[in-house]
Amino acid sequence: RDRGQVVKVLQDAVAASRNEKQNSQAMTHAWLFTGPPGSGRSNAAVAFAAALICENGGCGECSNCKSAIAGTHSDVELIKTEGLSIKIDEIRDLITRAAWAPAVSRYRVVVIEDADRLTESAANALLKAIEEPGAHTVWLLCAPTATDVLPTIRSRVRTLVLRTPSVNSVASLLEKEGFSKTISDFAARAAQGHIGRARFLAKSDVARSRRESILKVALSISDIASAFKSAAALVDAAKEEAEEESERRDEAELKALREAWGQTGTRLVQGGAKAIKELERDQKARSTRMIRDYLDSALLDIVTLFRDVLLVQSGSKEAIINSDLTAEIEKVAASTTPESTLGKIEAIMVARTNLAHNAAPLLTVEAMMVQLK
């Protein structure tokens, strides 16, 4: 569906939720928002949640809307996993909270941003909750595609498919936000329509410089030795970025938790030590996911490079994404064939799939880099 159709479906659902005389089929207790990264599936789910608990049907200005979007409303729970999976214990606790009566609204709304990361046991536990819904509970699940959730869950939710906005639309949005046309056009092309990624590239000189370094690493491969060297450089960069982010967040989280458990000196009240161990476990899982997410983003950037090579090989230069590397791209295009370029793109996509299935990062990237030489 296009965005206009999705908005209309959600508007009808909000209207039906506020007026029992309207078509009851427009509103249901469980929804699945699907779409590729950058399609806005999570933003759409959160906006829908805000509209459901808004006294005005989603004005975007009231305290209910603002707190729901900020993730601080008592009747809207946003589940954002920073680990590799969502486990059954987390879902059991969530189901218990979801059954509580709304505090100030008509509904208690639960948004699960990464429903595709549910373990099988967690998904089965969630299925039971969806099969036996509370009168005032609404479940909003988000995933890349409908096939990323259990078939039994798919059959019990209403699915909405969102599409990635066009590059031109994203560039126009960035210009309206105050970025120059040059930066907006580049960021939109480089992000291939992913609004969040495009905004990040537009804002950050460091991000643009890091992206250029990644592409130059891919261009530097000439033999097996350089392939292994490039793989190590990419994985080391991912680990370094994850460590920087972890250091920034971990100590503050531990300090806040110790204060919450009443630590004085080296002593914690009963249960505090267990809570700290659980936090440290979650922080380790988050760091692992950050490494994989960084690598996945880097591989997507490298895909754009070989996409450009393929365009040049096909006789077209108008839609090149990495125009600042045109000379290097033309050199690669002249020395290779379209068939080999397609093989390289396939190797990158296989590596992305393997990383998503928890393959060892260094071995995965090494295998890919060897095929890019």
Regions found by a protein language model. Give the residues of each.
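Charged, glycine-rich active-site and insertion segments that engage polyanionic ligands
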Residues: R1-A50, S67, A135-T137, P144-A298, ...
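Conserved phosphate-interacting/catalytic interface
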Residues: I302
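Conserved D-loop beta-strand region of ABC ATPase nucleotide-binding domains
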Residues: V110, L140-A143
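Conserved catalytic/switch belt of AAA+ P-loop NTPases
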Residues: A99, N124-L141, P151
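Short capping loops/turns at secondary-structure boundaries
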Residues: L84, D116-T119, C142, A146, ...
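Clamp-loader machinery-focused feature within the broader ASCE/P-loop NTPase space
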Residues: R1-S121, K128-E131
